[in-house]
Amino acid sequence: VFLAKMMDYLVHYETQTFLKQHPVSFVNWLPLDPMYHNYEFIDNEKIREYDNDLVSIDFTKFQSSELFVPDIFASYHVYPYYPDYIYMEEKYRNTINNKGNNDNFLGYLKDLKSRNAGIPLLIAEYGLPSSRGNSHYSTQGFHQGGHSELEQAHFSSILTTDIHESACAGGLYFEWTDEWYKHNWLVMDFQQPAERRKLWHNMENPEQNYGILAVE
């Protein structure tokens, strides 16, 4: 309800103030996608917080007035290594891309696209870091870190091609430059004092090394 009200407010404001209308959306991510993922089911209540399939937000449930011509589009941050179901579910990991290789990212995108049929799907974030540290492994090599810059470019080109092949509306690559202020569980306990983290570039930290342009 809150998300619908915020989009409604934005559309009304733009229409009445500027006499213009643009498509609207909000950013969603994989743990809130509308599909059921059996690899995420955890029956033990004590560790239920690790179940990334408990709640869903479905773009197809939102409806707009005929007076709002541009309409709503679906927007997701999608990374090929998290949550685990994106590379563990058989239908994703067995998907073959146009190079003849198994490609779990493409498999997930096709599933997400079909679940949002009739709605443009924008991949609002995707990418891989070129850090020394690796904070999340993927069975098909799309790790969250542990890549050289050359490997980062290679895998990123595969992800970009996948977005096109799955007929998405487009993709926003994450990201242009490295972000020195980011923290990551892999190294955060060793970055002391924490408030000085932004003053130096930590090559062990995956979150600081998504950029395709180094700032050093």
Outline where the language-model segments fall.
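Charged, glycine/proline-rich intrinsically disordered loops and linkers
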Residues: 1, 40-60, 187-208
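Active-site cleft segment of glycoside hydrolase catalytic domains centered on the general acid/base Glu
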Residues: 1-9, 13-14, 28-40
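Generic structural signal for well-ordered alpha-helices
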Residues: 3-11, 106-110, 156, 160
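Sec-exported extracytoplasmic/periplasmic mature domains
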Residues: 11-16, 164-168
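Glycoside hydrolase catalytic-domain groove-lining segments
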Residues: 18, 24, 39-40, 44-141
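Short, solvent-exposed turn/loop segments enriched in Gly/Ser/Thr/Pro and often Arg
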Residues: 28-30, 125-128, 172-180
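Aromatic-rich peripheral "rim/lid" segments of glycoside hydrolase catalytic domains that contact
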Residues: 133, 137-141, 162-169, 173-216
